Amino acid sequence: MVYGLPYKGSKNIIAKRIVDALPSGTNFLDCCCGGGAIVQAATLSGKFNTVTGYDINKSIIGLLQATMVDFGKIDYENFPVVSKEEFCAARDRNETINDFLIQYTCSFGNNGTTYLWGEHKTKYKTLMHNAIALPTMDQRRQALRDFMRCLVKDRLSNAELENLTVLDQATSLNRIHKVENTMRSRKSKTKLDLVCGSMFDIPFEKYDVIYFDPPYVGTSCYNKKNFDFIRFRKLLQVLKDMGKTVFVSEYNQPAEGFTEVKSFVKMMLMNSKGNIPVQEKLFYGGSKEQYNSLEGLSTLSEPDIDTTVLDDTDERAGEVETDRGVV
């Protein structure tokens, strides 16, 4: 199962394994929940009485609320093709659930900021969508005829034609729909709360298991905001001194006194470079012995290598977008 919304930097494929590696507790806190993969896995696990997800990104919290708590707010059957102008307007307005939905189904790499297609793809994708979704048969036929004329006129290569079959917007929308269906039918009684706010303003006292998945050092940050790594390390030290049970997903040790307790290797398919193994690590604010004494740790039964994750190449800028930034 893939957890969470389509979102840059998501832990969607390894979310269950991360939650399995956490101790059980009363109140679980994900301090920068992003696409909600960890909060969804934690809620479904039944290991906690309450799960709370914080994120500074208003639009992603709004979308998580609509798909994991307040169901029935999204019309999945009549979602239109979105132009670049409409995407930019929704991104800049950032007020309604439809604005939030457009940002994360119609953006490159689901980053919420950059339009999904370059100019040369937009006309084809729009015509393909119209050939399926327009209300009357005559309109659909005309869109299909226009699409075929464009193909003949522009003489696309086989690779370009194959690329057109990737239905990015529909795939993202379907993924969001699956999240809502899963959460709507869940059997766990765990209470889920989602809050828009900074991790530095969280009242940590009531939480007994705390998890951070910050932007990784050396990668592009999210939501066009610079992340304060120095302040973050100080926060980790404060929580550790308070005796809190704290975990951090990172590539390297996030702060002094944090110990690597698990690692997860996933194969990432980079269009220009082939498969690249990426190792993500889980750090605990204490020793390995202290970690092993925690209650509620699950046995990890899944294989160490994850299913391949496709990361797209942005032919507009000649950059490759990974799950943690542009390289």
Which sequence ranges carry the predicted segments?
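Long, positively charged, glycine-interspersed low-complexity recognition regions
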Residues: 217-218, 224-327
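General small-molecule cofactor/ligand-binding pocket signal
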Residues: 193-195
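Conserved proline-anchored active-site loop of SAM-dependent methyltransferases
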Residues: 18-21, 28-42, 53-58, 64, ...
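Short loop/helix-cap segments at secondary-structure boundaries that form the rim of catalytic
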Residues: 45, 202-206, 252-259
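Conserved binding-pocket/active-site segment within a compact domain
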Residues: 165-177, 202-203, 214-223
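S-adenosyl-L-methionine
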Residues: 1-27, 37-38
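Short, well-ordered alpha-helix to beta-strand connector turns
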Residues: 25-26, 48, 190-191, 206-207, ...
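Class I S-adenosyl-L-methionine-dependent methyltransferase module
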Residues: 45, 49-190
